[in-house]
């Protein structure tokens, strides 16, 4: 249904102005950005389709259509990912990518400006925003100062859906570059499970030993999946 056919107080823009953004659903907020749908598909339907769960190929686990699994997944959509959505032309893709990038930068700035990390949950939430929507495996490191304040986050290695090659020497060099006193390791499981594998446990201990040689502590290793995160430190595995 076209927005103009909705009652005025149910149209997303007017609803936002009258009641504030918290009163709107994710799809309604997204519809304001998109502004228009396409023939046979209203903008609210288009917005909801972007937020729907992805359809995965059972053989490979890769996305084979559908949406991005919510706002967190949409945050990591590339221009190529958005291009497959019928109804998103170059102008809409550019506007959407700009807004999503601003959201990522705001989260990064907020975390950098914390006096210290409030809790493991705050770090997990930040990592979910950055990693949960990826369709390939990424290994990232949060570099911290002596007060556990964030210096930088870097994605150091990218792999397939099932494995990634992580080189301890490179992690150590980046820690020295940032003059880090501690690190939080992180990687995602695109398959959806946050349970650590034996390889995850072995990698954690290898990196912990390598970083200890340069007096850098490993505080945690966080595993991220769509809608979930697990702290290996809280499981006694660090």
UniProtKB/Swiss-Prot annotation:
UniProt short sequence motif JAMM motif, positions renumbered to this chain: 187-200
PROSITE patterns, sorted: MPN (PS50249), UPF0758 (PS01302)
InterPro entries assigned: MPN (IPR037518), RadC_JAB (IPR025657), RuvA_2-like (IPR010994), UPF0758 (IPR001405), UPF0758_CS (IPR020891), UPF0758_N (IPR046778)
Domain spans labelled MPN: 116-238
Residue numbers binding Zn(2+): 187, 189, 200
GO biological process: proteolysis
GO function terms (MF aspect): metal ion binding; metallopeptidase activity
The entry's keywords: Hydrolase, Metal-binding, Metalloprotease, Protease, Zinc
Family: Belongs to the UPF0758 family.
Name of the protein in question: UPF0758 protein Dtpsy_2777
Species name: Acidovorax ebreus (strain TPSY)
């Amino acid at each position: 249904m076209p927005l103009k056919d909705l009652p005025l107080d149910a149209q997303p823009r007017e609803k936002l102005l009258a009641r504030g953004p918290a009163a709107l659903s994710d799809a309604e907020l997204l519809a304001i950005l998109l502004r228009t749908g396409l023939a046979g598909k209203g903008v609210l339907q288009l917005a909801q389709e972007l937020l729907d769960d992805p359809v995965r190929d059972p053989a490979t686990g890769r996305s084979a259509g559908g949406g991005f699994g919510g706002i967190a997944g949409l945050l990591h959509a590339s221009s190529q990912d958005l291009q497959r959505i019928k109804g998103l032309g170059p102008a809409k893709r550019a506007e959407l990518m700009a807004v999503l990038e601003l959201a990522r930068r705001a989260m990064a700035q907020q975390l950098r400006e914390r006096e210290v990390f409030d809790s493991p949950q705050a770090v997990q939430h930040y990592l979910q925003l950055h990693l949960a929507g990826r369709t390939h495996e990424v290994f990232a490191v949060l570099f911290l100062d002596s007060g556990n304040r964030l210096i930088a986050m870097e994605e150091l290695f990218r792999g397939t859906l099932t494995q990634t090659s992580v080189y301890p020497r490179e992690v150590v060099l980046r820690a020295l570059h940032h003059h880090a006193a501690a690190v939080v390791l992180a990687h995602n499981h695109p398959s959806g499970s946050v349970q650590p594998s034996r390889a995850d446990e072995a990698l954690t201990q290898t990196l912990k030993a390598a970083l200890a040689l340069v007096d850098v502590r490993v505080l945690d290793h966080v595993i991220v999946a769509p809608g979930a995160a697990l702290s290996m430190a809280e499981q006694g595995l660090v």
